[in-house]
Amino acid sequence: MNLPGPIHDFLLVFLGLGLILGGLGVVLLTNPIFSAFSLGLVLVCISLFYILSNSHFVAAAQLLIYVGAINVLILFAVMFMNGSEYYKDFNLWTVGNGLTSLICTSLFVLLITIISNTTWYGIIWTTRANQIIEQDLVSNGQQIGIHLSTDFFLPFEFISIILLVALIGAIATARQ
C-alpha cells in the first residue's frame, strides 16, 4: 500500500505487537482452543504484513489457505479430541514408536542422499531464456505460476508432501 510514512510505521508497529501477543498466546495459553484462536490472529497479522508490502495475491492466499483452512482444521481437531480421555493411558515410548522413528529417520537420510547426489540440470523443463514475455503484460498470478513451475518447483513439492503427511496424521488422530 502506498501510505504516508508515519501511518505505515504505525501499522507496522501495531501488526508487530499483534504478532508478538498472538505468538505468546499460542505458546502460553493452556486452553488449546484459545491457543488456536491466537494462531489465527498471528496468521491474519502476517497476511496484513503482506498487504502492507504490496503483495496482495500472497495476502489473499495466506488468508484463504492458512486462516480459512489450516486454522479451522486445527480447531476442528482440537474440539474433536477429548483431552482427558486422550492423556489417560499416555505412554512416553513404545516399541512401535521406536520402529516408526527408525523407519522415518532412514527414509529421511535416504531422501537427503538422493537429493544431494542428483544432477538437477536436465530436470528443469523451462528456463528464463526461453520465455519471451514482456514483464508488463504478465499479471502477478501468471508470474507466480511461472516461478512455481521453474524456480520453486522442488520447494513447492516438498510443501505438498508435508501437507499430505499432516493430513494423514490428522486423520489417524481422529480415528483413535
Curated annotation (Swiss-Prot):
Official protein name in the record: NAD(P)H-quinone oxidoreductase subunit 6, chloroplastic
Enzyme Commission no: 7.1.1.-
Function: NDH shuttles electrons from NAD(P)H:plastoquinone, via FMN and iron-sulfur (Fe-S) centers, to quinones in the photosynthetic chain and possibly in a chloroplast respiratory chain. The immediate electron acceptor for the enzyme in this species is believed to be plastoquinone. Couples the redox reaction to proton translocation, and thus conserves the redox energy in a proton gradient.
Gene3D superfamilies documented for this protein: NADH-ubiquinone/plastoquinone oxidoreductase chain 6, subunit NuoJ
Membrane topology listed for this record: Multi-pass membrane protein
Family: Belongs to the complex I subunit 6 family.
Localization: Plastid, Chloroplast thylakoid membrane
